[in-house]
Regions:
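Double-stranded DNA-binding cores of transcription factors and transposases
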Residues: 1-14
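Basic, flexible linker segments flanking DNA-binding modules
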Residues: 11-114, 119-120, 268-273
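Short, solvent-exposed loop/turn segments at secondary-structure boundaries
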Residues: 125, 146-147, 182-187
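Acidic/histidine-rich, metal-coordinating catalytic segments
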Residues: 164-186, 206-209
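Charged alpha-helix within mobile-element recombinases
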Residues: 192-282, 330
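C-terminal, beta-rich DNA-binding module of retroviral/retroelements integrases
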Residues: 249-356
Length: 356
Protein backbone atom coordinates (compact mmCIF):
# COMPACT_ATOMS: atom_id res chain seq x y z
CA UNK A 1 0.00 0.00 0.00
CA UNK A 2 1.30 3.41 -0.89
CA UNK A 3 1.72 6.05 1.80
CA UNK A 4 -0.84 8.34 0.13
CA UNK A 5 -3.45 5.57 0.19
CA UNK A 6 -2.72 4.89 3.87
CA UNK A 7 -3.40 8.50 4.84
CA UNK A 8 -6.59 8.51 2.77
CA UNK A 9 -7.87 5.55 4.78
CA UNK A 10 -6.69 7.09 8.04
CA UNK A 11 -8.53 10.37 7.32
CA UNK A 12 -11.66 8.45 6.36
CA UNK A 13 -11.50 6.47 9.61
CA UNK A 14 -11.11 9.60 11.75
CA UNK A 15 -14.11 11.17 9.99
CA UNK A 16 -16.17 8.04 10.72
CA UNK A 17 -15.19 8.23 14.40
CA UNK A 18 -16.23 11.88 14.56
CA UNK A 19 -19.61 10.96 13.08
CA UNK A 20 -20.12 8.00 15.45
CA UNK A 21 -19.68 5.36 12.75
CA UNK A 22 -16.47 3.78 14.04
CA UNK A 23 -18.17 0.43 14.71
CA UNK A 24 -19.47 0.11 11.16
CA UNK A 25 -16.56 1.70 9.29
CA UNK A 26 -14.76 -0.40 6.72
CA UNK A 27 -11.85 0.57 4.44
CA UNK A 28 -13.69 -0.50 1.30
CA UNK A 29 -11.95 -1.65 -1.83
CA UNK A 30 -9.22 0.05 -3.81
CA UNK A 31 -10.64 -1.01 -7.15
CA UNK A 32 -7.74 -3.30 -8.01
CA UNK A 33 -4.79 -2.83 -10.31
CA UNK A 34 -5.67 -0.27 -12.98
CA UNK A 35 -2.44 -0.69 -14.96
CA UNK A 36 -2.77 -2.82 -18.11
CA UNK A 37 -0.61 -5.91 -18.44
CA UNK A 38 2.65 -5.42 -20.29
CA UNK A 39 2.79 -6.86 -23.79
CA UNK A 40 4.76 -9.98 -24.63
CA UNK A 41 7.21 -7.83 -26.61
CA UNK A 42 7.90 -5.67 -23.56
CA UNK A 43 8.34 -8.59 -21.15
CA UNK A 44 10.57 -10.42 -23.64
CA UNK A 45 12.93 -7.43 -23.87
CA UNK A 46 12.99 -7.00 -20.08
CA UNK A 47 13.79 -10.69 -19.62
CA UNK A 48 16.56 -10.51 -22.22
CA UNK A 49 18.22 -7.48 -20.63
CA UNK A 50 17.95 -8.69 -17.03
CA UNK A 51 19.08 -12.23 -17.85
CA UNK A 52 22.26 -11.15 -19.66
CA UNK A 53 25.67 -11.50 -18.01
CA UNK A 54 26.21 -8.90 -16.62
CA UNK A 55 22.56 -7.81 -16.23
CA UNK A 56 21.36 -4.35 -17.19
CA UNK A 57 20.34 -1.96 -14.42
CA UNK A 58 16.66 -1.12 -13.90
CA UNK A 59 17.15 2.41 -15.24
CA UNK A 60 18.93 1.01 -18.30
CA UNK A 61 16.02 -1.38 -18.95
CA UNK A 62 13.50 1.47 -18.66
CA UNK A 63 15.59 3.55 -21.06
CA UNK A 64 15.84 0.70 -23.59
CA UNK A 65 12.07 0.08 -23.44
CA UNK A 66 11.57 3.71 -24.39
CA UNK A 67 14.27 3.71 -27.09
CA UNK A 68 13.38 0.41 -28.76
CA UNK A 69 9.64 -0.01 -28.17
CA UNK A 70 8.51 3.56 -27.34
CA UNK A 71 7.12 2.15 -24.08
CA UNK A 72 7.45 4.60 -21.18
CA UNK A 73 7.86 3.31 -17.66
CA UNK A 74 10.15 4.01 -14.71
CA UNK A 75 12.86 2.02 -13.00
CA UNK A 76 10.63 1.31 -9.97
CA UNK A 77 8.08 -0.47 -12.16
CA UNK A 78 10.84 -2.49 -13.80
CA UNK A 79 12.18 -3.40 -10.36
CA UNK A 80 8.78 -4.59 -9.11
CA UNK A 81 8.33 -6.70 -12.25
CA UNK A 82 11.84 -8.16 -11.88
CA UNK A 83 11.28 -9.09 -8.23
CA UNK A 84 7.91 -10.68 -9.04
CA UNK A 85 9.52 -12.79 -11.79
CA UNK A 86 12.74 -13.53 -9.85
CA UNK A 87 14.93 -11.65 -12.31
CA UNK A 88 16.20 -8.99 -9.93
CA UNK A 89 20.02 -8.80 -10.16
CA UNK A 90 22.00 -9.21 -6.96
CA UNK A 91 23.48 -5.73 -6.62
CA UNK A 92 25.63 -4.49 -3.79
CA UNK A 93 24.30 -2.07 -1.21
CA UNK A 94 24.77 1.56 -2.13
CA UNK A 95 24.82 4.21 0.60
CA UNK A 96 22.66 7.29 0.19
CA UNK A 97 24.56 9.95 -1.73
CA UNK A 98 25.33 13.15 0.09
CA UNK A 99 24.45 16.35 -1.75
CA UNK A 100 27.57 18.05 -3.10
CA UNK A 101 27.88 21.46 -4.71
CA UNK A 102 30.03 21.25 -7.81
CA UNK A 103 31.54 24.04 -9.86
CA UNK A 104 30.48 24.13 -13.49
CA UNK A 105 31.02 26.38 -16.50
CA UNK A 106 28.34 28.95 -17.32
CA UNK A 107 28.39 28.75 -21.12
CA UNK A 108 27.94 25.84 -23.47
CA UNK A 109 31.25 25.20 -25.20
CA UNK A 110 33.37 27.04 -22.63
CA UNK A 111 34.81 23.78 -21.29
CA UNK A 112 34.50 20.17 -22.43
CA UNK A 113 35.76 17.40 -20.17
CA UNK A 114 37.65 14.78 -22.19
CA UNK A 115 39.03 11.43 -21.10
CA UNK A 116 39.70 7.82 -22.09
CA UNK A 117 38.78 4.70 -20.14
CA UNK A 118 40.19 1.22 -20.86
CA UNK A 119 37.80 -1.64 -20.12
CA UNK A 120 36.83 -5.10 -21.38
CA UNK A 121 33.83 -3.69 -23.26
CA UNK A 122 33.17 -6.57 -25.66
CA UNK A 123 31.57 -9.75 -24.22
CA UNK A 124 33.80 -12.81 -24.12
CA UNK A 125 36.93 -10.78 -24.89
CA UNK A 126 39.72 -10.66 -22.32
CA UNK A 127 41.50 -7.80 -24.11
CA UNK A 128 40.63 -4.27 -23.10
CA UNK A 129 39.37 -1.67 -25.55
CA UNK A 130 39.35 2.07 -24.90
CA UNK A 131 36.34 4.38 -24.83
CA UNK A 132 37.00 8.02 -25.74
CA UNK A 133 34.35 10.17 -24.10
CA UNK A 134 33.70 13.93 -24.11
CA UNK A 135 31.17 15.97 -22.12
CA UNK A 136 30.13 19.63 -22.01
CA UNK A 137 30.73 20.95 -18.50
CA UNK A 138 27.81 23.40 -18.44
CA UNK A 139 24.97 21.32 -19.90
CA UNK A 140 26.33 17.75 -19.44
CA UNK A 141 25.65 17.17 -23.14
CA UNK A 142 27.61 14.05 -24.07
CA UNK A 143 28.95 15.31 -27.40
CA UNK A 144 30.84 12.15 -28.28
CA UNK A 145 31.66 8.58 -27.23
CA UNK A 146 33.43 5.98 -29.35
CA UNK A 147 35.30 2.71 -28.86
CA UNK A 148 38.78 2.06 -30.26
CA UNK A 149 41.10 -0.97 -30.06
CA UNK A 150 43.65 1.07 -28.07
CA UNK A 151 44.38 4.62 -26.97
CA UNK A 152 46.63 5.97 -29.71
CA UNK A 153 47.35 9.38 -31.16
CA UNK A 154 45.43 8.46 -34.32
CA UNK A 155 42.44 7.41 -32.21
CA UNK A 156 42.40 10.84 -30.54
CA UNK A 157 42.72 12.58 -33.91
CA UNK A 158 39.87 10.55 -35.43
CA UNK A 159 37.57 11.08 -32.44
CA UNK A 160 38.10 14.82 -31.95
CA UNK A 161 37.78 15.56 -35.68
CA UNK A 162 34.43 13.69 -35.73
CA UNK A 163 33.12 15.51 -32.65
CA UNK A 164 34.23 18.98 -33.77
CA UNK A 165 32.68 18.55 -37.21
CA UNK A 166 29.38 17.48 -35.63
CA UNK A 167 29.09 19.83 -32.64
CA UNK A 168 31.62 22.58 -33.26
CA UNK A 169 34.79 23.55 -31.41
CA UNK A 170 34.87 24.46 -27.68
CA UNK A 171 37.14 27.04 -26.12
CA UNK A 172 39.00 24.52 -23.95
CA UNK A 173 39.33 20.82 -23.12
CA UNK A 174 39.72 19.67 -19.52
CA UNK A 175 42.15 16.73 -19.55
CA UNK A 176 44.62 14.86 -17.35
CA UNK A 177 48.43 14.87 -17.49
CA UNK A 178 48.67 12.07 -20.04
CA UNK A 179 51.62 12.32 -22.42
CA UNK A 180 49.19 12.81 -25.32
CA UNK A 181 48.28 16.20 -23.80
CA UNK A 182 51.09 17.31 -21.51
CA UNK A 183 54.74 18.13 -22.08
CA UNK A 184 57.17 19.20 -19.36
CA UNK A 185 58.34 22.08 -21.55
CA UNK A 186 55.73 24.85 -21.06
CA UNK A 187 56.65 26.44 -24.41
CA UNK A 188 56.12 23.24 -26.41
CA UNK A 189 53.06 21.30 -27.54
CA UNK A 190 52.46 17.64 -28.02
CA UNK A 191 51.21 16.71 -31.50
CA UNK A 192 47.66 16.59 -30.17
CA UNK A 193 48.14 19.88 -28.32
CA UNK A 194 49.50 21.48 -31.48
CA UNK A 195 46.46 20.33 -33.48
CA UNK A 196 44.11 21.80 -30.87
CA UNK A 197 46.14 25.03 -30.70
CA UNK A 198 45.91 25.34 -34.50
CA UNK A 199 42.12 25.70 -34.15
CA UNK A 200 42.16 27.80 -30.98
CA UNK A 201 41.26 25.09 -28.44
CA UNK A 202 43.13 25.39 -25.14
CA UNK A 203 44.11 22.55 -22.82
CA UNK A 204 43.37 22.82 -19.09
CA UNK A 205 44.80 20.15 -16.81
CA UNK A 206 42.97 18.46 -13.93
CA UNK A 207 45.23 17.97 -10.89
CA UNK A 208 43.42 14.77 -9.79
CA UNK A 209 40.92 12.30 -11.30
CA UNK A 210 38.32 13.63 -8.84
CA UNK A 211 38.70 17.11 -10.33
CA UNK A 212 37.14 15.88 -13.58
CA UNK A 213 34.41 13.95 -11.81
CA UNK A 214 31.73 14.69 -14.41
CA UNK A 215 33.48 12.69 -17.13
CA UNK A 216 34.56 10.01 -14.63
CA UNK A 217 30.91 9.46 -13.67
CA UNK A 218 30.06 9.25 -17.35
CA UNK A 219 32.62 6.45 -17.69
CA UNK A 220 30.85 4.62 -14.87
CA UNK A 221 27.52 5.18 -16.64
CA UNK A 222 28.81 3.61 -19.87
CA UNK A 223 30.40 0.66 -18.07
CA UNK A 224 27.10 -0.14 -16.38
CA UNK A 225 24.95 0.60 -19.44
CA UNK A 226 26.94 -0.47 -22.50
CA UNK A 227 28.55 -3.72 -21.32
CA UNK A 228 25.25 -5.48 -20.41
CA UNK A 229 23.60 -4.31 -23.65
CA UNK A 230 26.47 -5.63 -25.75
CA UNK A 231 26.21 -8.96 -23.93
CA UNK A 232 22.41 -9.11 -24.32
CA UNK A 233 22.58 -8.35 -28.05
CA UNK A 234 25.63 -10.62 -28.61
CA UNK A 235 27.67 -7.79 -30.14
CA UNK A 236 31.30 -8.90 -30.15
CA UNK A 237 32.91 -6.48 -32.64
CA UNK A 238 33.81 -2.80 -32.36
CA UNK A 239 31.84 -1.87 -35.48
CA UNK A 240 28.57 -3.13 -34.00
CA UNK A 241 29.42 -1.66 -30.59
CA UNK A 242 29.98 1.80 -32.09
CA UNK A 243 26.72 1.53 -34.05
CA UNK A 244 24.92 0.87 -30.75
CA UNK A 245 26.76 3.79 -29.13
CA UNK A 246 25.60 6.07 -31.96
CA UNK A 247 22.00 5.19 -30.99
CA UNK A 248 22.43 5.35 -27.20
CA UNK A 249 24.23 8.71 -27.17
CA UNK A 250 21.42 10.93 -28.57
CA UNK A 251 18.77 8.97 -26.66
CA UNK A 252 20.54 9.60 -23.35
CA UNK A 253 21.02 13.29 -24.15
CA UNK A 254 17.38 13.82 -25.12
CA UNK A 255 15.39 11.58 -22.77
CA UNK A 256 17.34 10.85 -19.55
CA UNK A 257 17.07 13.46 -16.80
CA UNK A 258 20.40 14.40 -15.25
CA UNK A 259 20.32 14.14 -11.47
CA UNK A 260 22.27 17.35 -10.80
CA UNK A 261 20.55 19.49 -13.46
CA UNK A 262 16.98 18.25 -12.93
CA UNK A 263 16.51 18.16 -16.72
CA UNK A 264 17.88 16.37 -19.75
CA UNK A 265 21.23 17.50 -21.21
CA UNK A 266 19.41 18.34 -24.46
CA UNK A 267 16.99 20.62 -22.57
CA UNK A 268 19.92 22.26 -20.75
CA UNK A 269 21.65 22.77 -24.10
CA UNK A 270 18.55 24.35 -25.65
CA UNK A 271 18.13 26.58 -22.59
CA UNK A 272 21.74 27.75 -22.89
CA UNK A 273 21.18 28.60 -26.56
CA UNK A 274 17.94 30.47 -25.76
CA UNK A 275 19.71 32.48 -23.04
CA UNK A 276 22.65 33.16 -25.39
CA UNK A 277 25.05 31.25 -23.16
CA UNK A 278 26.95 29.53 -25.95
CA UNK A 279 30.54 30.14 -27.03
CA UNK A 280 30.82 27.15 -29.35
CA UNK A 281 32.44 27.80 -32.72
CA UNK A 282 31.47 25.91 -35.86
CA UNK A 283 34.20 23.96 -37.60
CA UNK A 284 34.81 26.28 -40.55
CA UNK A 285 36.08 24.79 -43.84
CA UNK A 286 39.87 24.67 -43.69
CA UNK A 287 42.25 23.23 -46.32
CA UNK A 288 44.57 22.07 -43.53
CA UNK A 289 41.88 20.04 -41.72
CA UNK A 290 42.85 16.50 -42.92
CA UNK A 291 46.55 17.18 -42.29
CA UNK A 292 46.24 18.84 -38.89
CA UNK A 293 44.34 15.76 -37.62
CA UNK A 294 47.08 13.37 -38.73
CA UNK A 295 50.25 11.93 -37.24
CA UNK A 296 53.10 14.08 -38.59
CA UNK A 297 56.75 13.14 -38.91
CA UNK A 298 59.63 14.87 -40.68
CA UNK A 299 61.22 12.82 -43.47
CA UNK A 300 64.33 13.61 -45.51
CA UNK A 301 64.19 12.91 -49.25
CA UNK A 302 66.88 10.46 -50.32
CA UNK A 303 69.63 11.15 -52.83
CA UNK A 304 67.57 9.11 -55.30
CA UNK A 305 64.64 11.57 -54.95
CA UNK A 306 62.51 8.99 -53.15
CA UNK A 307 60.86 8.66 -49.72
CA UNK A 308 60.01 5.45 -47.84
CA UNK A 309 56.39 4.23 -48.04
CA UNK A 310 56.07 1.00 -46.10
CA UNK A 311 58.58 -1.47 -47.57
CA UNK A 312 58.83 0.50 -50.83
CA UNK A 313 60.30 3.81 -51.99
CA UNK A 314 58.35 6.36 -54.05
CA UNK A 315 59.48 9.33 -56.12
CA UNK A 316 58.45 12.70 -54.71
CA UNK A 317 58.35 16.20 -56.22
CA UNK A 318 61.03 17.60 -53.90
CA UNK A 319 64.81 18.03 -54.24
CA UNK A 320 67.11 15.39 -52.71
CA UNK A 321 67.90 15.83 -49.00
CA UNK A 322 64.97 18.21 -48.57
CA UNK A 323 62.81 17.77 -45.47
CA UNK A 324 59.12 17.05 -46.05
CA UNK A 325 56.20 16.35 -43.71
CA UNK A 326 54.74 12.85 -43.65
CA UNK A 327 51.06 12.86 -42.57
CA UNK A 328 49.41 9.57 -41.62
CA UNK A 329 45.62 9.87 -41.46
CA UNK A 330 43.46 7.79 -39.06
CA UNK A 331 41.92 6.02 -42.08
CA UNK A 332 45.38 4.92 -43.27
CA UNK A 333 45.82 7.46 -46.09
CA UNK A 334 49.36 8.81 -46.35
CA UNK A 335 50.30 12.31 -47.51
CA UNK A 336 53.64 14.05 -47.98
CA UNK A 337 53.55 17.85 -47.64
CA UNK A 338 56.17 20.44 -48.48
CA UNK A 339 55.60 22.34 -45.22
CA UNK A 340 54.01 21.80 -41.84
CA UNK A 341 50.48 23.22 -41.31
CA UNK A 342 50.52 27.01 -41.33
CA UNK A 343 47.32 29.11 -41.13
CA UNK A 344 48.95 31.79 -43.30
CA UNK A 345 49.66 29.40 -46.18
CA UNK A 346 47.96 26.65 -48.14
CA UNK A 347 48.98 23.00 -48.12
CA UNK A 348 51.22 21.78 -50.93
CA UNK A 349 50.74 18.02 -51.38
CA UNK A 350 53.80 16.35 -52.91
CA UNK A 351 52.61 12.73 -52.73
CA UNK A 352 49.39 10.93 -51.79
CA UNK A 353 49.38 7.20 -51.09
CA UNK A 354 45.77 6.06 -50.49
CA UNK A 355 45.00 3.09 -48.29
CA UNK A 356 44.09 -0.11 -50.12
Amino acid sequence: MARARFYELYSDYLLACAQGRSETWSPGRSGGDHHPDWSAEVTALITKLLASKPPSSYSAVASELHRRLHFKTDRASVRRWAIAHQLNPDTRYKPVRKPVKRWQARDYGALWQYDATPHAWLPGCSDKQVLLDILDDATRLNTGARLYPAETLLAHFDFLARVFQTHGQPLALYVDYHSFFYTHNPDAFTQLGAALHFYGVKLLYAPTPQAKGKIERRHDYWQKRLVPLLAADHIIELVGANQLLDQLLPHGNQHEIHRELGQTPHAAHQQALAEKRSVIRPAAPCPWWPYVWSQQTRVRVGDDGKVPVGDQRHFIAAPPRATVIRCLRPDGDLYYLRHAPDPKAKPLVLLHVPVF
